[in-house]
UniProtKB/Swiss-Prot annotation:
One of its GO terms (molecular function) is ATP binding. Residues 351-416 form the S4 RNA-binding domain. It is an enzyme of class 6 (ligase). It catalyses: tRNA(Tyr) + L-tyrosine + ATP = L-tyrosyl-tRNA(Tyr) + AMP + diphosphate + H(+). InterPro entries: aa-tRNA-synth_Ic (IPR002305), Rossmann-like_a/b/a_fold (IPR014729), S4_RNA-bd_sf (IPR036986), Tyr-tRNA-ligase (IPR002307), Tyr-tRNA-ligase_bac-type (IPR024088), Tyr-tRNA-ligase_bac_1 (IPR024107). This is Tyrosine--tRNA ligase. It is found in: Cytoplasm. The lineage of its organism: Bacteria, Pseudomonadati, Pseudomonadota, Alphaproteobacteria, Rhodobacterales. HAMAP family: Tyr_tRNA_synth_type1. The keyword Chloroplast does not apply. It comes from Cereibacter sphaeroides (strain ATCC 17029 / ATH 2.4.9). ATP binds at residue 240. Its main location: cytoplasm. GO terms for cellular component: cytosol. Its EC number is 6.1.1.1.
Amino acid sequence: MTYHPKSDFLRVMQERGYLADCTDMQALDEALSNGVVPAYIGYDATAASLHVGHLLNIMMLRWLQKTGHKPITLMGGGTTKVGDPSFRSEERPLLTPDRIDENIEGMRKVFARYLSYGEGATDALMLNNAEWLDQLNYLDFLRDIGRHFSVNRMLSFESVKSRLDREQSLSFLEFNYMILQAYDFLELFRRTGCRLQMGGSDQWGNIVNGIDLTRRVLEGEIFGLTSPLLTTSDGRKMGKSAGGAVWLNGEMLAPYDFWQFWRNTTDADVGRFLKLYTELPVEECDRLGALQGSEINAAKILLANEVTTLLHGRDAAEAAEATARAVFEEGGVGGALEVVELPAATLGDGLSVAHFLVAAGLVASGKEAKRLVAENGLRFNNEPVGDANAPVTAATVGEELKVSIGRKKHKLVRLS
């Protein structure tokens, strides 16, 4: 029997498809209905930007704030030094403290687009777990915190078990990650009254550890809520495209390319993505998702515009749509295409088409370039390129050269 929550937040989570599991739905619903509930999601600083795979949880924090509660973004300045082993086949490379700080700053820019930070009761709060983890005394930590954890139970978590079943090494460093993340929840409850941790369903074991620890040490009534691990209808992991990670920082992925990622959504995913990644009413999302044939393209454009507006602003979304129209309908260049700077010295007296594409970073290898040409998938300034060995010179590039790879990838190459 489906539980029907009375709190606005849980109702939104349920209606829009954010909810995978909850440790105690009715008790959490009661807490959310009777006052402001601080809730957090943790983010390790493993890259200079968040990517589309993080966006679902960011939207959960945004809805939390919109429904009258306090979102906490916890930066993993401490835990990033250890690395989360959850469902990974190998240990993460360790980052320097300076690199971690740089990554946190890049992530901060993204959160500021979705959440309102400040000192008010429902204003978002950003914390860094290095504040308390860097100060821990190891022996005290083992005595006061470590004694509450069962190694047998930790080994039973699917995130660890799957790694051990494949006979892949799990370092003691990584094993400690679960204890440190659990300690984060305890520390946040102590410092801010945080009562809810959210995350992807792969974090269930870590979340439950934190709840158990906090109940044992501080007897706090706290909760966990997870979202589904999202894949596209054709089985691809959310956050990746053929060209790599879909970054949320505009410096790492142009707003046009971000817009195009959403415009390329498969028909079967449109309704679901509208509910998860926009704030359009659920009924409208369902109506748009049910469109068929050419009509669904209008829904995809709306999806791309709404998601891009939230991240980059309305002007960027409108510019991206105008560029797409120029590229696909009018054969033009469009002012918002990403520019690739190629040193003139690299081009020299000329390169073959295949070597030019590799040098500009547009394909990974000469073999890929030749396949692209053989399949009639390459155009220069809207003209088909039929010979992978044809010369490309400074005269070919001119002031700028529009390179089209397939129907949906377009770049401007300029000599520097």
